[in-house]
């Protein structure tokens, strides 16, 4: 069964179509990468999927249920998790409490919550800073904290919006290992600029350009495709 | 009195209320529209206008007409200066943060009101109108010979009340002309549209803000000077104009001047007419609830783009 | 962490013990004042729950205080209900009014929320005046001594009154501390810190806010009902705008979002007004000056400043 099916999504901003008739289907256990040049509509598309933005047209099914009109918090409660492109955490609360807020909704009691939090922090290697205020973390650690908040919800679909943006090289390598760990039991939708990361972790890549799906295929296909290369001309992200 | 003449009287009295209210509320609308802040002390500037008008005419004791004429010019300027001072010393320092501005203007409200109580005292004092001829008004009745006019007892209005309506209309027209036609109005509208952009174009936004806050208070004070010969000056008289101005500004589409004037007419006239049928308290309850519901259910519709 | 918990226990336990012990040393006049302060601090705590912990600034809490006051007063004086039941009716009335106003007002935010709550409270005040035959309008009515028996205790007796005020204060204070440490309270704080994130973690933010309004209203109503029972008077002035401004003033002065702020704020403001009203009828001048001064120089309030400068562990 497909975890997420989006059909004919359209989003207009004052006559401009930021997302123009996008159809997308993500099967279970897949790591799907969403790439495209700046302004291609990636973040808008993810906004539609997570419910932060309303669709002008189209239909979204999640786990076989129509969620087009479902408010964002209910989508999350149904098993979506979302990490923000611009780090969005609770700065004055401790790292532990940040993850606890994410986990608590699904836990029966505080003891359960603590166990889930400890596990999530261990997976992103942040256990040693559990009692630090989130504001005092380095930028890279804050990004990892976001991911831990996503993981602690044991989501069916984890949406990661540019998770490696601003990370150091070593941190990116850690992140790739983390995705390989996550993919064991979670479907992932990954918006990513870094093509190295995409090549290493994605099963299928969707390329977005001018709000439309330009191409869809395996990482190798994408690299071979001339249209995609053209779309990226001027954006210096294609290294391979 | 028959119903017809009675209704006409209510309408005329309502028109006086509407005129004064339109002046007061347009001051509040101006401040909200351009500065995006809610001035809770607006009613106290109204009250100060009335109290200072009493003070000026009292000083001029022997010549009430001249005293009133001076008050009409000087008092709004005094109140505007005071408001400008409050803007520069308080509101500017908290960066016009919307919520903190409300708290600060609540503080200003109490300061103005209580200082008035300490100096002017708790009494209500009248101001003599400069002229006050009673004008009897005709009504028609159907007789066997067709329609004929007669002068029902009690159906009358004073020349002063008519003058208030005229003066308010004149001032509002002047305000509209300043906003639309003058360079100052252009700068104000630019500041209203986009503060950052206005700054970039070299418009002295801070001075515009101080001026607008002063003008807003000055309009309230002017309305109060006009109304004080009809209604006495008292240190607690600011509450009602504040509440009514809120209602008018919200119905009129926050910050829009023509909308505010229209809403003031609607509220002022219906206030006079409704109180013929309902108790004034019930009318106030309904108006308050109506406005709250408007804010709750039609925020975009009323304000254009969501401003509050 | 553990040492902070100990310090907290020591400080708050100390404050409660001191409040309890005060009654044995205070002269009669101040004895009555402190009882009044504890009831008003309960009102302030109800306000702080919403303003300090959810960042919702209401300008209409008097309607909740009055709902408790009149709910109790009418039940006890007109319907012949016993005082304890009257108290419960008062709290329930506050909760219901809170649910209705909350459900409507929460559709707005920021300045519109402030104005909508102000308008609803004004309507509430006018409604009390309109039904003057029952409420006696501005004049208000006295609750007879026979109606002020609480399980045999005569609430008009100063010492029993002090105990009652102290009990209500303690229960409210401890429930708020417990609430803040519960998952519910932690979620409220998360919503205050970053509402958008809380939504994207699957929380129904509106529901949490509505519950917070209802709790806040019920606590304010508890204070109102207690005030009526302890001091034997129910009047419309308690529903006026001034009584919506007071809790804002107290909480701003004491420190929004601090546990002890409401008590500290009420204490200082009460005595400031008490002293100045001995000197002039224009005693509300003090309130105005304090409001302006706080927004300009100390937006965090007394306890907030203490927390910022000295005791970071204060809740």
Describe the role of every protein-language-model region.
Chain A
Residues 1-240:
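Glycine-rich phosphate-binding loops of nucleotide-dependent enzymes
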